[in-house]
Amino acid sequence: MKDKKHVQLPNGLIKTDSIVPKDLLVYLAIKRFEDWETHTAYPSLKEIAKVCGCTEKTVSESIKRLVATDYLEVEKYKKGKKYFFKKYKGFEAFALEFLDRNDLSFTEKQYLAAQQQFLILENNLGKTTYSSYEMSNKINMSPSTIQRCDRSLIAKEYLTIIPTKVKDEETGLLKNEKIFNLEKFGQAVVFVLKNHEKSIQELKEENESLKKNQDIILREINKLKTARGEAELIL
């Protein structure tokens, strides 16, 4: 059975104008230390920076933006800080295996984290026909940085780009499809959770169907009882 250990990233976070992809990775790094009962975490800047693969200064700047956009609360705690996470509805899951990968750079991880919610997920793959410019507008990362990440991910065999027969409405050129092998770079958890969610939904629907059948049977029994009572009165 594949590991379901993961960290959750709120879906709406990257849609906030002042938030940039590196902030998402910092959020994930802090959340990795979360106490699930209290929804608080106590990592030092050094620990957060180590998980991210960046400097403590970068971490501090990201924390300021996360606090300003109300996704994170920070309080002084002893010699360090205590972090509180705000409630959210939809989320993307990121495996600890993904966060710990040494063959992905800080920039590549933030890119993959930011764009995951815009992918079509199926068969351990994540697909999109968004161009670098279109994705740039969605995740607040420059097209040149996205293209650089794509080239690196192709070299690592984590990404394949193939031509499609779909035309871009603006340029008239044929679109390319980017296919990310999520399982290969540690994100199989997405599909484990997806299948788990599907199983829960199927059980829920099955229970609802059984309940409906039970209700129908009870109504029929009551009708028979009523009819029997009326027959006895006639006799």
Give, region by region, the residue ranges found by the protein language model.
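Electropositive, intrinsically flexible nucleic-acid-contacting patches
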Residues: 1-235
